[in-house]
């Protein structure tokens, strides 16, 4: 075994907990420092009005056997398969997501549909050569008109910048290999392909007690293996060894300094670098990296499920909300026998936006007004509201962000005794499965002396083998 024995993990989200669990199983002493009072990070589940809800929609899907095996090891049989239904709301019309040809044709009308097809054909005949930005990347695959209808407004709500200023990496990671042709083929030739694009997956595994149940159980297992989780314990800074033989340290906000053999950090990379004695150039690069915040407005609705989807994407520019989750349509067990429906409207902003500090009653009033505007809920059906603010949810892939991230990546990678993982820590737009994989491989680098490049793991990661979770466990898929 590697001589490293005592490991500190900053953050109890999917990445940090997965690393801690694997190391604890291998006999390491692990201590987790979590700034909040709960585990799970963005994937935690909370109790609200007698029901269980997540911080927005958190489906789980992976084709990596290591991730799926860990997920099943933790959750056991306490999950159900959910048939996914998500649609796009645009100008008071619902469009199937992923695209179905007839649905789009009737939804947009013959004239608009003809223009969309013409625009798509033009993009195939005369593609724009420089695909550095999101708008060009998507337009080349869907046509400019479909881009303007189904991508532009939503993306600009989410990121708070023009699509011309959004790096193509976002599209390449999230909708890689997907185009209008592929979407139509998937809709028309059902079952033609054994491997669906992740965006098109129509069934997913969901724990009976919410997405966060996986991480609650993982935390229990870590504790039973001798690990320690410190709640409400934000880390101020990481102090790395200056001389050979010295241990890296963490400094708490109270000023306490603790030594470890290795530190795994999932705290925001900007915060990590900003509080370390690093060269000015590295600090300047880190300061150019920004995160987007989320405001979640939950509404208790006295009605049966207002719509059949698990969530809908709101592309209408006249509404500020970008996504609406309906927790009535996940699994019955999270309802705890309650008849009311809980909806969650998502809004996105920066720290500097006045919206971020808007009072709770104003946010609830705005969300109530907007859900009425959609026509999904009647005026008198909203009975209560609750606001949760989640800072630094989304790493913003502004055009040219890599020229700032790569020097920071290289600098941190060369530091002994430190691993950086997770959506916050690595500035990667990860799903749960990629953060879990980061944690697993970070643990292997320590316990097995592996040399996994953790920076390579994100939604663009290619798996050597493929499997998926089904109602009866793992199902292996032939990649040939």
Question: Where are these predicted regions, by residue range?
Answer:
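N-terminal Rossmann-like FAD-binding beta1-loop-alpha1 element of flavoenzymes
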Residues: 5-32
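Conserved Rossmann-like nucleotide-cofactor binding loop
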Residues: 15, 38, 270
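Glycine-rich FAD pyrophosphate-binding loop
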Residues: 24-47
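Dinucleotide-binding Rossmann-like beta1-alpha1 core, especially the glycine-rich loop
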Residues: 49-126
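Active-site/ligand-binding neighborhood in enzyme catalytic cores
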Residues: 93, 114-237, 241, 248, ...
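Acidic, glycine-rich loop-and-beta core segments that form the ion-binding/anion-interacting portion
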Residues: 229-276
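C-terminal segments that line or cap access tunnels to active or ligand-binding sites in enzymes
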Residues: 260-262, 269-419, 425-430, 437, ...
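Active-site-proximal substrate-binding core of FAD-dependent oxidoreductases
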Residues: 447-480
């Amino acid at each position: 075994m590697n001589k490293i024995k005592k490991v500190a993990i900053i953050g109890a989200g999917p990445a940090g907990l997965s690393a801690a669990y694997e190391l604890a199983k291998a006999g390491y002493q692990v201590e987790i420092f979590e700034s909040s009072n709960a585990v799970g990070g963005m994937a935690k589940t909370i109790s609200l009005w007698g029901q269980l809800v997540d911080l927005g929609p958190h489906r789980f899907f992976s084709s990596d056997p290591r991730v799926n095996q860990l997920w099943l090891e933790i959750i056991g049989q306490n999950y159900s398969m959910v048939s996914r239904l998500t649609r796009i709301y645009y100008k008071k019309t619902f469009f199937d997501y992923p695209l179905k040809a007839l649905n789009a044709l009737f939804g947009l009308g013959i004239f608009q549909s003809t223009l969309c097809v013409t625009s798509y054909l033009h993009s195939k005949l005369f593609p724009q050569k420089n695909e550095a930005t999101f708008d060009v990347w998507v337009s080349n695959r869907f046509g400019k008109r479909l881009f303007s209808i189904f991508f532009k407004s939503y993306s600009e709500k989410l990121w708070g910048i023009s699509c011309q200023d959004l790096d193509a990496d976002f599209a390449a990671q999230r909708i890689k290999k997907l185009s209008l042709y592929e979407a139509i083929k998937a809709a028309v030739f059902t079952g033609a392909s054994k491997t669906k694009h992740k965006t098109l997956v129509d069934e997913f595994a969901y724990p009976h007690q919410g997405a966060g149940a996986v991480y609650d159980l993982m935390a229990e297992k870590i504790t039973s293996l001798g690990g320690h989780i410190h709640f409400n314990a934000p880390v101020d800074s990481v102090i790395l060894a200056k001389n050979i033989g010295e241990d890296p340290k963490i400094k708490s906000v109270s000023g306490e300094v603790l030594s470890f053999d290795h530190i795994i950090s999932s705290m925001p990379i900007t915060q990590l670098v900003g509080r370390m004695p690093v060269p000015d150039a590295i600090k300047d690069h880190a300061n150019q990296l920004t995160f987007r915040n989320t405001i979640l407005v939950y509404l208790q609705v006295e009605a049966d499920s207002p719509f059949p989807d698990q969530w809908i994407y709101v592309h209408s520019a006249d509404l500020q909300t970008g996504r609406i989750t309906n927790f009535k349509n996940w699994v019955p067990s999270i309802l705890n026998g309650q008849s009311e429906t809980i909806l969650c409207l998502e809004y996105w902003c920066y720290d500097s936006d006045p919206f971020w500090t808007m009072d709770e009653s104003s946010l609830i009033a705005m969300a109530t007004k907007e859900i009425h505007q959609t026509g999904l809920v009647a005026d008198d059906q909203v009975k209560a509201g609750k606001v949760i603010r989640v800072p630094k949810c989304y790493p913003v892939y502004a055009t040219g962000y890599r020229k700032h991230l790569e020097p920071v990546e290289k600098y941190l990678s060369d530091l002994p005794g430190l691993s950086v993982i997770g959506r916050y820590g690595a500035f990667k737009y990860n799903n749960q499965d990629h953060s879990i994989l980061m944690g697993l491989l970070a643990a292997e680098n320590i316990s097995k002396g592996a040399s996994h490049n953790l920076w390579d793991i994100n939604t663009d990661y290619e798996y050597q083998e493929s499997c998926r979770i089904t109602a009866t466990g793992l199902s292996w898929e032939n990649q040939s």
